[in-house]
């Protein structure tokens, strides 16, 4: 039976943490010291066993770009390669790769199968140890698919390399939903749009007849919840990506906005505003029954649930200015970091205003937007209010969301007054800020789970 695995054998030494050694476990530090240097990695073109050399070359280009985008790897220039006659079935000449100071070498083959599918096999070598690094106990991996699905093969290859070298969960084979913005400011068109994590395959999901905001993926990555002004007032909707079906979620009085799925996908958290007061609600998607989470005269908004489903972080101005609070999902009192017990505990006490909190998939951090001194920041803080770190700074940085492995944050930025919004990402070290290319101006990004 054909194994839907990707033939990949990789081994690398990191110049960051230790000198090359045949006996040491090869790891790349995700959060290295201040003098961090990317690990040199060589990925030659695939050995083509067929006629479609263009597709084979494109697959390698995506793998290289994915890995280089992390800031952890330095892709060696193919023009510098001494050994040209590489084969997945033959051990490489390691001396040739040491000369150009390559720590890791990835060798692969591309095949066109009789049934019309394609297969990609990979082996990856530790240049200094002169040996293969096994993945899940196997010396290689192989993955097959239809030709039109070639980009997913590339992302899965990059995911395998990244995970084996860093020990972190993967995140390349994912999608990003966002708001595509066009037109003048007084007649702005805002549409739901979706793309691969690297910006490829961009498409619109809604026609732009109604303004939409704050899209969020379901845990299955098959549905999106968002706010739409359809019908003249902001309300929360569900959108099925496969069918294109849009559905109003509840018929609350007043307005509903800032939705987000629960971690199990069975409920949606949202804000409901009526008569000048905003509180948090959670709705069961099977029964369509809703339960009120907060009941306070202040403005409570932007709820995000912890990975275990037991807690919710949100923004409230109940202390006089927008700050971050944490509460138990069942509404019971909890012990607060500042001492005492309360239904909702404040976790931000530094200068500035805090908003749009998002709980990390790892459970240890909350990402947020901070406004202070005329500037905006994307930052992270421990769930107990300790260890605040600001990762970005700009005229306007807003709307963070996590990659599924909790190592990268996507957000949108306006670099100066009058500049249109663009999507950016940053890793937890704060040193790898990158702009994500979109066809239009873009805001309100959200990252999907890994695709199945």
Residue ranges and their predicted role:
Residues 169, 181-191, 207-210, 227-236, ...:
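A flexible loop/linker signature enriched in serine peptidases of the S9 family
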Residues 128, 196-200, 240-244, 284-288, ...:
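Short loop/turn segments that connect beta-strands within beta-propeller blades
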Residues 176, 224, 265-269, 309-313, ...:
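Hydrophobic beta-strand positions that form the internal "hydrophobic ladder"
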């Amino acid at each position: 039976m054909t194994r839907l695995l990707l033939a990949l054998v990789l081994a690398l030494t990191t110049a960051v943490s230790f000198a090359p050694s045949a006996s040491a476990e090869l790891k790349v530090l995700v959060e290295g010291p201040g003098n961090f240097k990317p690990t040199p990695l060589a990925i030659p073109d695939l050995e083509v066993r067929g006629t479609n050399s263009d597709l084979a070359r494109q697959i390698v280009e995506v793998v290289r770009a994915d890995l280089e985008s992390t800031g952890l790897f330095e892709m060696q220039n193919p023009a510098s390669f001494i050994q040209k006659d590489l084969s997945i079935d033959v051990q490489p000449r390691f001396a040739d790769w040491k000369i150009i100071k390559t720590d890791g070498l990835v060798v692969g083959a591309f095949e066109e199968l009789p049934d019309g599918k394609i297969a990609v096999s990979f082996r990856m070598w530790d240049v200094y140890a002169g040996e293969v690094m096994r993945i899940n106990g196997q010396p290689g991996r192989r993955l097959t698919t239809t030709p039109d699905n070639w980009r997913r093969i590339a992302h899965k290859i990059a995911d395998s390399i990244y995970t084996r070298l860093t020990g972190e969960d993967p995140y390349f084979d994912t999608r990003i939903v966002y708001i595509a913005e066009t037109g003048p400011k007084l007649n702005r068109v805002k549409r739901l749009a979706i793309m691969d994590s690297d910006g490829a395959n961009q498409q619109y999901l809604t026609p732009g007849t109604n303004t939409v905001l704050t899209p969020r993926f379901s845990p299955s990555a098959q549905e999106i919840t968002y706010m739409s002004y359809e019908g003249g007032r902001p309300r929360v909707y569900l959108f099925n990506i496969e069918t294109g079906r849009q559905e109003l979620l509840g018929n609350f009085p007043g307005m509903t906005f800032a939705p987000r799925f629960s971690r199990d996908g069975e409920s949606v958290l949202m804000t409901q505003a009526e008569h000048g007061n905003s509180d948090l609600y959670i709705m069961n998607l099977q029964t369509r029954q809703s339960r009120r989470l907060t009941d306070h005269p202040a403005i409570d908004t932007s709820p995000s649930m912890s990975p275990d489903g037991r807690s919710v972080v949100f923004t409230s101005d109940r202390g006089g200015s927008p700050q971050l609070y944490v509460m138990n999902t069942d509404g019971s009192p909890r012990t607060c970091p500042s001492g005492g017990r309360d239904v909702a505990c404040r976790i931000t006490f530094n200068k500035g205003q805090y908003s749009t909190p998002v709980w990390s998939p790892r459970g240890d951090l909350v990402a947020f937007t901070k406004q202070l001194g005329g500037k905006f920041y994307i930052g992270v803080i421990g769930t107990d209010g300790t260890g605040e770190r600001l990762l970005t700074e700009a005229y306007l940085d807003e709307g963070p969301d996590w990659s599924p492995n909790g190592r990268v944050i996507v957000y949108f930025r306006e670099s100066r007054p009058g500049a249109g919004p663009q999507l950016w990402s940053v890793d937890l070290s704060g040193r790898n800020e990158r702009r994500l290319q979109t066809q239009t101006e873009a805001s309100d990004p959200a990252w999907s789970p890994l695709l199945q």
